[in-house]
């Protein structure tokens, strides 16, 4: 008969399960927050979509707001800031177009604006994790102003394409709009090199 040694643990498997569970919850939350918003999404719905017990949402994230904040943290602009300034417009617009059916962080943020706590979390996140790093990367002159203008440009486009779809943003017109958005994005970036 084999008696297990207490030093032999199964923690790595449990840890992998915990990581997988946490990731499933975050994926489900991103999907629901970006299609329904914060106020219209329940913890039970997130858990059901993730295939887990709803108590695990509280265990991993503390609250629905904690889950929302963690979902925001999944959004990371820093990989986009590793590239060349001269091709940033093409690269960044490609990010928007490469997965058009995926749940989007912008939709999640906009649809969650009605809730005061989610609104505050979104504004804080946007400034700290998007505008400030983008401004620092753009550098002088007026990196913060240029970062804000890029955010305005991208937000306006994504709202018109995803949330309040303009019918003429399809087919060849969408391709032309993509080229325009790339050029406008690059023009704002290039203001610092003129």
Task: Give the label of every model feature segment.
Residues 119-124, 136-194:
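Hydrophobic/aromatic-rich alpha-helical bundle segments in the mid-to-C-terminal region
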């Amino acid at each position: 008969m084999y008696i297990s040694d207490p030093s032999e643990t199964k923690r790595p498997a449990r840890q992998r399960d915990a990581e997988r569970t946490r990731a499933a919850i975050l994926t489900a939350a991103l999907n629901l927050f970006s299609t329904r918003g914060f106020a219209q999404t329940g913890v039970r719905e997130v858990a059901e979509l993730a295939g887990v017990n709803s108590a695990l949402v509280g265990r991993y994230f503390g609250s629905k707001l904690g889950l929302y904040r963690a979902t925001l943290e999944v959004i990371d602009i820093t990989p986009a800031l590793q590239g060349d300034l001269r091709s940033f417009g093409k690269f960044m617009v490609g990010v928007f177009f490469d997965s058009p059916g995926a749940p989007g962080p912008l939709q999640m943020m906009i649809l969650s604006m009605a809730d005061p706590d989610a609104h505050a979390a979104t504004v804080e996140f946007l400034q700290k994790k998007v505008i400030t790093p983008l401004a620092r990367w753009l550098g002088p002159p007026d990196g913060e102003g240029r970062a804000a203008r890029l955010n305005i440009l991208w937000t306006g486009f994504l709202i018109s394409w995803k949330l309040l779809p303009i019918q003429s943003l399809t087919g060849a017109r969408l391709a032309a709009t993509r080229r325009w958005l790339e050029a406008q994005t690059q023009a704002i970036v290039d203001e610092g090199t003129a």
